[in-house]
Amino acid sequence: MTAPSQVLKIRRPDDWHLHLRDGDMLKTVVPYTSEIYGRAIVMPNLAPPVTTVEAAVAYRQRILDAVPAGHDFTPLMTCYLTDSLDPNELERGFNEGVFTAAKLYPANATTNSSHGVTSVDAIMPVLERMEKIGMPLLVHGEVTHADIDIFDREARFIESVMEPLRQRLTALKVVFEHITTKDAADYVRDGNERLAATITPQHLMFNRNHMLVGGVRPHLYCLPILKRNIHQQALRELVASGFNRVFLGTDSAPHARHRKESSCGCAGCFNAPTALGSYATVFEEMNALQHFEAFCSVNGPQFYGLPVNDTFIELVREEQQVAESIALTDDTLVPFLAGETVRWSVKQ
């Protein structure tokens, strides 16, 4: 006789960092998010990037058109900051409810970020306007100088960019996205109520050994890159502590298989199908399931000044196997934990 499976009921979560891409890829991946999450902060790094209200409205409609009937999902749009962005356009989008936040990519830090910001000084008028109107700044926190080691880029960003910026614009709300280091965990924990962070499932579950020992695992390659074990442990301890300015942001970032399994592969984990169960596994391992709902469903809305979702979902603790791949029009998509047996999954 099998033991009854354990069920975890939580308020419907939100994903505060998500890549949906565009075109056929968007149509394939949207349902994996919209069936579980009430809202998601949608990244603007398309080609070309989303830098105008008009582009954001059109992109939001393409996303909504891809949401299956019966799913109640709201995409929250972001503006891609560039050196030439007009502060008035940004403010208009925020006031009209089109832009929820703006995204700072250091130029060439990650996928489709060649249009990114060359220096914080270059966009200071925009950042000052954001501070004035209360618009959150979302930051990919890595320096991109060629001489700085890839494993050190987040820590260096804190001292050279993040801290000077926050000293200068003390009222600016900042989300330090997808943090990966003890340095960042400590920095956010020691910060004030205007600084928060998101953490991905892969950075909680894995460290760089998992990606590199016994063969390179391209589907664990993302940016910021997985770090050593001490950093992974610091992230796990931060979420397990119940700290209320860290929240769910999957950074789910789909690439077709041939673009991942390549001599020069793309960065990004497509974790939308398995992220929530992965987070539950980590919280269970840390004996911190009492803080799971807040991380998924409460801390984010609280920081953004939005209401929590009023519906609930259930996760069930029973072993299930993750699909090896998901069909695309002319390729396949390999989900995070493909082919593996997972402990927690969303109850259908």
Curated annotation (Swiss-Prot):
Record-listed N6-carboxylysine modification sites: 103
GO terms classed as biological process: 'de novo' pyrimidine nucleobase biosynthetic process; 'de novo' UMP biosynthetic process
Record InterPro entries: Amidohydro-rel, DHOdimr, Dihydroorotase_CS, Metal_Hydrolase
Enzyme Commission number: 3.5.2.3
Superkingdom: Bacteria
Active site (record annotation): 251
Coiled coil: none
Disulfide bonding pattern of the chain: none
CDD domains: DHOase
GO MF annotations, alphabetized: dihydroorotase activity; zinc ion binding
Pfam families in the record: Amidohydro_1 (PF01979)
Root EC class: hydrolase
Residues binding substrate: 19-21, 45, 140, 223, 255, 267
Cofactor binding note from Swiss-Prot or TrEMBL: Binds 2 Zn(2+) ions per subunit.
Binding site for Zn(2+) 1: 17, 19, 103, 251
Binding site for Zn(2+) 2: 103, 140, 178
Quaternary structure and partners: Homodimer.
Protein name, per record: Dihydroorotase
